[in-house]
């Protein structure tokens, strides 16, 4: 799951 806003990381 994306832990950031849009980033997939």
Curated annotation (Swiss-Prot):
Tissues and organs where the protein is expressed, per its UniProt entry: Expressed by the venom gland.
Record keywords: Antimicrobial, Secreted
Localization, UniProt: Secreted
Major site of localization recorded for this protein: secreted
GO annotation, cellular component aspect: extracellular region
Source superkingdom: Eukaryota
Protein name: U1-poneritoxin-Dq1b
